């Protein structure tokens, strides 16, 4: 299968919010997988997940992990309208994720 259990659970929990409370032209959901995700399963799963999807090779994956200081998955990087970004693994808490994204949309 593709993506880890916690990643799939997070995707499942946030999917309904994309059509309701977190629906916004100013919010882009970006999903990144690496080559450990089997290609056939990956291509089968992504049509049901709203957002932009990228499957990276090892070099690209390492670059992003180094750039954003990612040491585990799922990881959340919040990129703000002004282009600044921060690693926000506290956003694994879906209530906090929802609150934070609503605040960012309102800015």
Language model: regions and residue ranges:
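Short acidic-hydrophobic, aromatic-tinged amphipathic segments that line or gate anion-handling sites
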Residues: 53-57
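Active-site beta-to-alpha loop of glycosyltransferases that engages the nucleotide-sugar donor
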Residues: 1-5, 9
